[in-house]
Regions:
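Conserved C-terminal beta-signal and adjacent last beta-strands/turns
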Residues: 9, 260, 302-304, 484, ...
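Gram-negative outer-membrane beta-barrel transporters
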Residues: 441-447, 540-542, 564-644
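Short acidic/polar hinge/loop motifs at secondary-structure boundaries
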Residues: 65-66, 147, 184-212
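Short, acidic, small-residue-rich periplasmic hinge/interaction motif at the N-terminus
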Residues: 32-40, 46-48, 75-82, 92-138, ...
Length: 715
């Protein structure tokens, strides 16, 4: 018995010793977090160490207790204007780790991809790129992507017409502006090339990148006037979620939910939104906007089998329904759906010098007529679809060279019940592309990028579009220059339209149309010194073979409309940007644009062109209850919109009709106040838009509006 007890006691001692050896020691990590500019402590910063974390107090001090010894990665989480800071340490005892966080005022350290299809710091990008970041969108209280663009890019004009909201930038309409989401093209929804930007959830935008001028060498057709690429948010935490709700005049509601996860090999993000409004006007006097109801949902999933490979899938759905005003005699209203599906995968070599990516994307637009007197039966009027497949290989043979080559195939299809002929008809277009680009560091601070694309289109044949960009950097100056070509393929509607427009006129397409060709050149200088950033750029854009619609009076006196390649246009202008942090609290941004956009066949300005335009914002970044807030006053100013045309009289004489809108400026004031408690953030937004209640016949706006919004986020 005694021997048995002794053996049991010895066994217990051995197990205890083994447990003691197996237990990982834990230590505390502490430190302070301060602002880089003011050196003031930052309360409310959440610092994580794996699954553990701690939040800074009023003195900027934090403590994370019982962190297992070994390699530890520390991360800060604060308001979006302060980027996440990361520190890796080897924890062998109680340790002090301090952080100095810099609030990002400029975007020069932002990583961009649109100008070269490769990741570059904005300051190092050879192609001049405009970036609208998440923090600018939040501080401006923007509720839509369109508002974000108007707040930051001068010269954007929205002109409602029978084909939707036509967006013009520097005299060129939607046909010449290529819209992308994460590098993939959005299908246009009408003959005007319009894209409903409300399908993009503004709360899901990480940043918006825009490059001006010809970019067909990388992106193909339509990249004539500008390329706008929306980069969506990716999950960064093990679990994150947020919810938004806002209300504005005319019973305008915007609500949204999202959740995401980022694990070792798997990531996913799902979001959904509902927007609605009672609209305004409809009495025949003044501006009018229909009541509407929108729904949208997005799902992104990614898998990383190894640190050198990844596979991603994305799905997006959007529904937009507009309603007739009270008392309307219309027996139907419009409904549209957008569906996008995509997948891509990448593989890189062990030394990261070579990487390949294959992507496939499908985007389809459905147009319905809802028959109100037939139990809201839906009649499908039109569909537009776009399928794109792309392979890209990026190779970095030396530190001075970066090479890109790729293949691309695109298939476009339109179905219409009546506009492509008297019977339901389907028309298609295909194009195959090969493209290449080489970037070379000629000297230490002198880079050159040359690229070209060859396109074979099933309708008009071949197009070759080369491009060259240069950048030279000296001290605080960056000089960029470039020349490039672009093309716009005629749309299916311009080629094959054949319909009677409610007895008022006939519209006929022209299958013999050729592609429009553009030649773009630009020079720019950028200066950055401390808290000041200024840039000046000049450009010249000449577009030939411009497709124009013209009228013919037939023998019966009826009006017939046709398309032909008869005109050309020349755009020349100057853009100026200015950003400065006057103190640790006040940030000032201003943008000015001059654009002379001439239709060379008439010598007149392009329709809706605005010669002078600008945007300005003053943002006060202060503190309430020792936590930050922002107060912004922002405005956008436009000279008159120009409407010029030549009218031919019955005797053959020609007169020039010239009309213009009033010049205008639209101002808003926005207060954004976040509250942070550990991993939780509550943010309240108050906004007064169109502060001075500007109204004008050509300007579709309900006048002064008030908005209140609230957002909750967990990370």
């Amino acid at each position: 018995m005694k021997k048995t007890a002794t053996a049991l006691f010895s066994l217990l001692l051995a197990i205890s010793a083994l447990n003691a050896q197996g237990q990982t020691k834990t230590y505390d990590i502490s430190g302070t977090v301060v602002d880089s500019l003011s050196s003031e402590p930052l309360p409310g910063v959440y610092v994580t160490a794996g699954s553990k974390g701690g939040q800074t107090n009023g003195d900027g001090h934090y403590v994370i207790k019982n962190v297992p010894a070994g390699k530890v990665t520390l991360k800060t989480m604060y308001y979006s204007s302060y980027p996440t800071a990361t520190r890796e340490i080897e924890l062998t005892g109680d340790t002090t780790v301090d952080f100095i966080l810099a609030e990002q005022i400029f975007n020069i350290n932002e990583v961009v991809v649109t100008g070269t299809r490769t990741e570059k710091r904005l300051a190092e990008a050879p192609v001049l790129t405009t970036v609208i970041g998440e923090r600018e969108i939040e501080k401006a209280g923007s509720v839509s992507m369109l508002e974000s663009l108007q707040d930051n890019i001068p010269g954007i004009v929205i002109s409602p017409n029978a084909m939707g909201n036509n967006m013009r930038i520097k005299g060129l309409n939607s046909r010449y502006i290529l819209m992308l989401v994460d590098g993939e093209r959005l299908v246009s929804e009408g003959a005007g090339g319009n894209v409903n930007l409300d399908q993009i959830d503004v709360n899901n935008i990480e940043r918006i990148e825009m490059i001006n001028g010809a970019a067909s060498a990388l992106y193909g057709s339509n990249a004539v006037g500008a390329v706008i690429n929306v980069i969506t948010k990716k999950p960064v935490h093990k679990f994150e979620a947020d919810a938004n709700a806002s209300w504005a005049n005319h019973n305008t509601w915007r609500t949204r939910l999202s959740a995401g996860t980022n694990l070792k090999k798997f990531s996913a993000r799902a979001s959904g939104f509902r927007n609605s409004s009672d609209g305004f006007g409809g009495d025949g006097e003044g501006a009018y906007a229909a009541a509407y109801e929108d729904y949208g949902a997005t799902l992104n999933m990614g898998y990383r089998p190894t640190d050198r490979s990844d596979v991603n899938v994305v799905g997006r759905f959007f529904s937009h329904e507009t309603f007739n005003p009270t008392g309307s005699m219309n027996a139907s209203h419009a409904l549209s759906h957008n569906l996008s599906l995509g997948a891509n995968g990448g593989l890189s070599s062990a030394d990261k010098r070579n990487s390949m990516r294959l992507s496939v994307n499908f985007d389809k637009y459905f147009d319905y007529e809802v028959l109100e007197k037939k139990n809201d039966t839906k009649n499908k009027d039109n569909t537009s679809s776009y399928i794109s497949a792309r392979f890209i290989d990026t190779f970095i043979p030396t530190a001075k060279w970066e090479l890109i080559g790729g293949l691309e195939y695109n298939h476009e299809e339109n179905f219409a019940t009546s506009t492509l002929g008297a019977t339901p008809t389907t028309k298609t277009l295909d194009d195959a592309n090969v493209f290449a680009q080489a970037e070379y560091e000629i000297l230490k601070n002198f880079d050159a990028v040359a690229g070209a694309r060859y396109t074979y289109n099933s309708q008009f044949g071949s197009a070759f579009t080369p491009k060259l960009s240069l950048m030279y950097e000296v001290a605080e100056w960056r000089f960029r220059g470039g020349v490039g070509t672009a093309f716009r393929a005629p749309s299916i509607k311009e080629l094959y339209y054949d319909f009677d427009h409610q007895g008022m006129f006939w519209v006929y397409g022209n299958p013999e149309l050729k592609a429009e060709k553009g030649l773009y050149s630009s020079l720019s200088a950028e200066y950055t010194e401390g808290l000041l950033n200024v840039s000046v750029s000049a450009y010249y854009n000449n577009i030939n073979n411009k497709i124009t619609q013209y009228d013919v009076i037939n023998a019966a006196g009826g009006n017939e409309k046709y398309y032909k390649n008869v005109s050309s246009a020349t755009l020349r202008g100057i853009d100026v940007t200015f950003s400065y942090l006057f103190s640790k609290h006040l940030a000032v941004r201003a943008n000015y644009s001059f654009c002379d956009a001439v239709d060379n066949s008439t010598g007149l300005q392009l329709e809706d062109n605005v010669k002078h335009s600008g945007t300005v914002s003053l943002t006060w970044n202060g503190r309430i209850a020792r936590s930050p807030f922002s107060l912004q006053i922002a405005g956008r100013m436009n000279s008159p919109k120009l409407y010029q045309q030549i009218i031919t009289g019955s005797d053959g004489s020609q007169t020039v009709s010239m009309e213009e809108s009033d010049p205008y400026s639209i101002w808003k004031i926005v207060l954004v106040k976040p509250f942070r408690i550990n991993k939780h953030t509550i943010e309240v937004t108050f906004k007064v838009d169109n502060l001075f209640n500007f109204r004008e016949a050509s300007f579709v706006d309900p006048g002064r509006q008030f908005l209140i919004g609230i957002r909750y986020a967990f990370k």
